[in-house]
Swiss-Prot record:
<keyword id="KW-0808">Transferase</keyword>
<protein>
    <recommendedName>
        <fullName>4-diphosphocytidyl-2-C-methyl-D-erythritol kinase</fullName>
        <ecNumber>2.7.1.148</ecNumber>
    </recommendedName>
</protein>
<feature type="active site">
    <location>
        <position position="9"/>
    </location>
</feature>
<dbReference type="GO" id="GO:0005524">
    <property type="term" value="F:ATP binding"/>
</dbReference>
<keyword id="KW-0067">ATP-binding</keyword>
<comment type="pathway">
    <text>Isoprenoid biosynthesis; isopentenyl diphosphate biosynthesis via DXP pathway; isopentenyl diphosphate from 1-deoxy-D-xylulose 5-phosphate: step 3/6.</text>
</comment>
<dbReference type="GO" id="GO:0019288">
    <property type="term" value="P:isopentenyl diphosphate biosynthetic process, methylerythritol 4-phosphate pathway"/>
</dbReference>
<dbReference type="InterPro" id="IPR014721">
    <property type="entry name" value="Ribsml_uS5_D2-typ_fold_subgr"/>
</dbReference>
<dbReference type="InterPro" id="IPR036554">
    <property type="entry name" value="GHMP_kinase_C_sf"/>
</dbReference>
<dbReference type="InterPro" id="IPR006204">
    <property type="entry name" value="GHMP_kinase_N_dom"/>
</dbReference>
<dbReference type="InterPro" id="IPR020568">
    <property type="entry name" value="Ribosomal_Su5_D2-typ_SF"/>
</dbReference>
<dbReference type="GO" id="GO:0016114">
    <property type="term" value="P:terpenoid biosynthetic process"/>
</dbReference>
<comment type="function">
    <text>Catalyzes the phosphorylation of the position 2 hydroxy group of 4-diphosphocytidyl-2C-methyl-D-erythritol.</text>
</comment>
<keyword id="KW-0547">Nucleotide-binding</keyword>
<dbReference type="Pfam" id="PF00288">
    <property type="entry name" value="GHMP_kinases_N"/>
</dbReference>
<dbReference type="GO" id="GO:0050515">
    <property type="term" value="F:4-(cytidine 5'-diphospho)-2-C-methyl-D-erythritol kinase activity"/>
</dbReference>
<dbReference type="InterPro" id="IPR013750">
    <property type="entry name" value="GHMP_kinase_C_dom"/>
</dbReference>
């Protein structure tokens, strides 16, 4: 039996460069894991079973897709029982399903004694979902391509965030489709790449008083969901240094000086799903 944590993520920045011939988009993003996590328990079994409170079909669960993808790649027909205890909300832009899938691949690689390397697990994960490869290289990475090109970085300073999620979710597919219709995508790769590295350097050094966060998906999301903009503004009023939509949403995070300040801000968001979290640093615990 194995018990594993599947950590959530936030995007400090996302630039969408272009739509690809395969229907995906080329992006460049700075992503970091946070200490909010799901818990997965893996037990040897004759067949695939997933025990969870999620009200979705087993076949649509990324954990199930990860198991099947690993079986197909290796030819192994072993089963597994997975007990999935969710803390990361669905449709939140926090990568919960993707993290669960990556955690499943890593756990079964150990449980089934497959001895696959990270590169192989990365490739299997990328065939299931675009965000999955990041979760093999925590805690912080620059992610490019459709999410399958990952550059791991180092960081030793942890930051306090307040996560606020309204009572609706946002479809990633919708967010990108709407972006295509309403936004002229930039192709200034060198400029964007430099901005991403500047942002990383600010985070690495702890100089976050005058740094800039951005998310190309925000514009179309804010037009359809004005409540997101309201949350962003309220986070600033509550003392956050900055606030941003994570991924395609619907979670917004605010960056605070410390945990005390973030907890004080909770009173502004009664009725919302909220969590005070820390960004993860090396070594992971």
């Amino acid at each position: 039996m194995l018990t594993c944590k599947a950590f959530a993520k936030i995007n400090w920045a996302i630039s969408v460069l272009k739509k690809r011939d395969d229907g995906y988009h080329d992006i460049i993003s700075l992503m970091q894991a946070i200490d909010l996590h799901d818990t997965l328990i893996f037990k040897s079994s004759q067949k695939i079973e997933i025990e969870t409170d999620l009200l979705i079909k087993k076949e649509n669960n990324l954990v199930y897709k990860a198991i099947k993808a690993l079986q197909n790649y290796t030819g192994i027909k072993k089963g597994v029982t997975v007990i999935l205890k969710k803390e990361i909300p669905l449709g939140a832009g926090l990568g919960g399903g993707s993290s669960d899938a990556a955690t499943t691949l890593k756990a079964l690689n150990e449980l089934w004694q497959l001895n696959l390397d990270i590169k192989t697990l990365h490739e299997i994960g990328a065939s299931i979902g675009s965000d999955i490869p990041f979760f093999f290289y925590l805690p912080i990475c620059i992610v490019e391509g459709r999410g399958d090109v990952v550059k791991p970085l180092k960081i030793s300073k942890s930051y306090t965030l307040l996560l606020v999620k309204p009572d609706f979710s946002i479809s990633t597919e919708w967010a990108y489709k709407t972006l295509d219709l309403k936004t002229e995508l930039t192709t200034e790769y060198e400029k964007i790449n430099n901005n991403i590295w500047q942002l990383y350097n600010h985070l690495y050094s702890g100089d976050v008083d005058n740094f800039y966060l951005w998310n190309d998906l925000e514009k179309s999301v804010l037009e359809k969901y004005p409540e997101i903009d309201k949350i962003k503004r309220k986070l600033i009023e509550a003392g956050a240094k900055s606030s941003l939509l994570s991924g395609s949403g619907s979670t917004v995070f605010g960056l605070f000086n410390n945990k005390t300040d973030a907890q004080k801000a909770l009173k502004f968001f009664e009725g919302y799903w909220c969590r005070v979290v820390q960004t993860l640093v090396e070594p992971l615990k």
